[in-house]
Every structure is written in structure tokens, then in C-alpha cells.
């Protein structure tokens, strides 16, 4: 198995855990709403609207127990819990899980059913067979150097007929022009992007039947252009990705926009069944 130290170091470098909680308590003494937390905890391309669209692929009655792999600081989890899903989040970065729980505790929106945060490796999921009705990935598979192992583990923990849904960044036609740093990697050796063809083949090889694959790239580019304009205004936001990534995010955000515009990366939504 690959070592995860470079990944945790990448996410630890700019993380201001204590300052984040102080900022929230100061500006939102009654507790933040999901939308107020979104600039901090919805770190993926598309923000809270993209999470809403992804969750719409699941039904809380049919897919009651959900595993969010690479859950980060929990924006997707809290949004899903508000819809009635029982969500377990798994992340390799323990400080993210601690912050995730603290944000949930502070949140104005009651998470009923409660959320569960687990520190662990997606290549060796610490759950029994057939434990979940659905598995979510949102901008997390690209951090995983052994995606075949990860998808095999997903197949193991999903019940028969369970669903896997993804909102992922994949390689574009001009992947050789990919500029770093980006939010998921500071250097090329820590970026593990697949092409759409590679990803769908891996799903099929691991026993999944593809339901749909939708290219979100044009919408993602428009969203990132709007975010870039906001980031260049003198107004200081209460919360932003810089509380997670530090000053590096200014360069990361610029590169992300250029990578989308240059077709170095694409953004896709995928759903599959086992």
C-alpha cells in the first residue's frame, strides 16, 4: 500500500483548526447555517449546489445508510443528514475528522440522524460486508493512488443492489498541461487523476453496472470563474478555503480555473450499481 504521509502533510500545511472555530463562534454565535459553512466545508468545484445535485441521485428511504469516502471537513455529510440520510464519513486525515465533528457540534442545523466520522484508509475500509446502501465520492478518488483497491472495497461494503455515486475530477484531453499546485495536490506525483474511460472500466471490472456518466465541465468552469471574481474582491469573507489551505489557495484557485479552461481536467458525475 502507498504511504499517506504526503497527503496528510498537504492538507495539514495550511489548516487553521482552532482559528476556524474561533471565527465561527465570533461571527455566528447562534451557530452557522449550512450555507454559511459552505465556503469552508464545500471545498469541491460547484460548492453546495453540486452537493445538492449529487445527493439527489440517492433516496433516503432506499439508501438510508451512506458512506462518504474522503469526507474532508463534512459539508456533504451535513447536507445529506439534513435530508434524512444516515451518513458515515471516512477520511485519512484525522485533523479533518476532528474539525468535521466540531463543525457539526457548532452547526445551527440539527444533524438528526447523527453523523459518524472515521479515520481510515479507503483501501482497507474498516466496515463489514454489505454495511451500506450507498457510497459517495466527491473530489476524493483523485487523492487515491490505488483506485482499483478502493473500488473493490466499495463493492464489498455495499449491499447487493447498492449504489455508488461520484462527483469527480478526471483527466482532460490536455492533461499534460495540468498546472500545480491544485487543491488536491501540490505536485504531479501526488495527483492520481484517471480518464473517464479508465474510471468507468475500473467500475465495471469491480462488479459495478454503470447507470450514467455526465460531463459537468462547462458548468464547473462557469462556477469557478464566478468564484475567482469573488476571491479578487477586497471584501474579506468570514469563511473561505484559505482557512483550510492557507495563502496557497490563491495560486491553487487560479490554476484550477486555468486547468478547466484549458481542458487539462474535466468534472464528471457518475452513478453505478452493484
Language-model features, listed with the residues they occupy:
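A short glycine-rich, Lys/Arg-flanked "PGG" loop and its adjoining helix->strand segment in the class I
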Residues: 148-163
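Short, glycine-/aromatic-enriched active-site segment of Class I SAM-dependent methyltransferases
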Residues: 169-190
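Short alpha-helix
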Residues: 192-206
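N-terminal auxiliary segments of SAM/dcSAM-dependent transferases
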Residues: 1-24
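Conserved alpha-helix/loop element of class I SAM-dependent methyltransferases that forms part
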Residues: 44-62
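Class I SAM-dependent methyltransferase SAM/SAH-binding core
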Residues: 67-124
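A short acidic, Gly/Pro-enriched loop at the edge of an enzyme's catalytic core
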Residues: 123-134
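Conserved Class I S-adenosyl-L-methionine
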Residues: 212-274
Amino acid at each position: 500500500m502507498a504511504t499517506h504521509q504526503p497527503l496528510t502533510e498537504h492538507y495539514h500545511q495550511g489548516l487553521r483548526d482552532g482559528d476556524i472555530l474561533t471565527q465561527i463562534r465570533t461571527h455566528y454565535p447562534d451557530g452557522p447555517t449550512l450555507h454559511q459553512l459552505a465556503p469552508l466545508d464545500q471545498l469541491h468545484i460547484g460548492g453546495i449546489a453540486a452537493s445538492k445535485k449529487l445527493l439527489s441521485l440517492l433516496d433516503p428511504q432506499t439508501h438510508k445508510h451512506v458512506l462518504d469516502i474522503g469526507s474532508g471537513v463534512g459539508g456533504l455529510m451535513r447536507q445529506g443528514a439534513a435530508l434524512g440520510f444516515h451518513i458515515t464519513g471516512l477520511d485519512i486525515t484525522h485533523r479533518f475528522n476532528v474539525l468535521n465533528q466540531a463543525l457539526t457540534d457548532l452547526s445551527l442545523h440539527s444533524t438528526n440522524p447523527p453523523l459518524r466520522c472515521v479515520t481510515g484508509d479507503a483501501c482497507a475500509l474498516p466496515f463489514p460486508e454489505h454495511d451500506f446502501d450507498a457510497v459517495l465520492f466527491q473530489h476524493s478518488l483523485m487523492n487515491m493512488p490505488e483506485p482499483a483497491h478502493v473500488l473493490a472495497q466499495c463493492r464489498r461494503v455495499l449491499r447487493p443492489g447498492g449504489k455508488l455515486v461520484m462527483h469527480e475530477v478526471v483527466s482532460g484531453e490536455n492533461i499534460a498541461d495540468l498546472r500545480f499546485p491544485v487543491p488536491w495536490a501540490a505536485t504531479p506525483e501526488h495527483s492520481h487523476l484517471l480518464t473517464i474511460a479508465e474510471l468507468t472500466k475500473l467500475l465495471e471490472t469491480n462488479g459495478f453496472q454503470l447507470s450514467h456518466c455526465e460531463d459537468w465541465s462547462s458548468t464547473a468552469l462557469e462556477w469557478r470563474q464566478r468564484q475567482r471574481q469573488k476571491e479578487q474582491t477586497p471584501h474579506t469573507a468570514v469563511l473561505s478555503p484559505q482557512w483550510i489551505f492557507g495563502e496557497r489557495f490563491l495560486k491553487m484557485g487560479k490554476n484550477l480555473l486555468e486547468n478547466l479552461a484549458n481542458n487539462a481536467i474535466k468534472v464528471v458525475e457518475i452513478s453505478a450499481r452493484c
